Amino acid sequence: AGDTSSEAKGMWFGPRL
């Protein structure tokens, strides 16, 4: 879900944030 962040953070912020 996210590159730098975890899957949970990827859904909230985005694939980069």
UniProtKB/Swiss-Prot annotation:
It comes from the Eukaryota. Keywords: Amidation, Neuropeptide, Secreted. The modification Leucine amide is found at residue 17. InterPro entries: Pyrokinin_CS. It is found in: Secreted. One of its GO terms (molecular function) is neuropeptide hormone activity. The keyword Secreted applies. Its main location: secreted. PROSITE patterns: PYROKININ (PS00539). GO terms for biological process: neuropeptide signaling pathway. GO terms for cellular component: extracellular region. Myoactive. Belongs to the pyrokinin family. This is Pyrokinin-5. It comes from Gyna cf. cafforum (strain SR-2005) (Cockroach).
